[in-house]
Amino acid sequence: MKPVLVLAILAVLFLRLADSVPRPLDVVVSEIRSAHFRVEENQCWFHMGMLYFKGRMSGNFTEKHFVNVGIVSQSYMDRLQVSGEQYHHDERGAYFEWNIGGHPVTHTVDMVDITLSTRWGDPKKYAACVPQVRMDYSSQTINWYLQRSMRDDNWGLLFRTLLVYLFSLVVLVLLTVGVSARLRFI
């Protein structure tokens, strides 16, 4: 009974560890160009080699405004245009929402820029987001986390990934080999 209880407690701890990953950093640029616009939500994260963006910006918008979400890297530059269908206007005012899921990234991403411009104006940077890695320990993702942690020299991610992988191997061996619940060391 003790090993089952210990394994259940460890499973709960690891599940809580996966859920306790900090929320993505919200880095708002200090030089806001106008007090008429406000970034209310700004998140970006990695999951299985894909980059996800989610955010909301409100203010004094017209249909001529559009928001660009761009990936900034030392070796690569990509601008994802968010316009048209994300523009909303209701009793609270006009706002933009973006929820871009699963943009494939094969390079190092340093930052995600949020820029605002009109059809004829120059884009002005309003916010930036540093992507965080969201943890999902399944058999398909372990290899991706190991590669990413070694590439980025992220020892915490490497340690957590190896710990969860070894724990899952031990549980797999205990369940498949049929070891009795009376282990001497527990």
Curated annotation (Swiss-Prot):
It comes from Human cytomegalovirus (strain AD169). The signal sequence is not cleaved. N-glycosylated; mostly exists in a high-mannose form. Residues 35-133 form the Ig-like H-type domain. Residues 182-186 are cytoplasmic. Disulfide bonds join C44-C129. This is Membrane glycoprotein US3. The lineage of its organism: Viruses, Duplodnaviria, Heunggongvirae, Peploviricota, Herviviricetes. Keywords: Disulfide bond, Early protein, Glycoprotein, Host endoplasmic reticulum, Host membrane, Host-virus interaction, Immunoglobulin domain, Lectin, Mannose-binding, Membrane, Signal, Transmembrane, Transmembrane helix, Viral immunoevasion. The gene is US3. The chain crosses the membrane at residues 161-181. Glycans are attached at N60. Residues 1-160 are lumenal. Belongs to the cytomegalovirus US2 family. The keyword Disulfide bond applies.
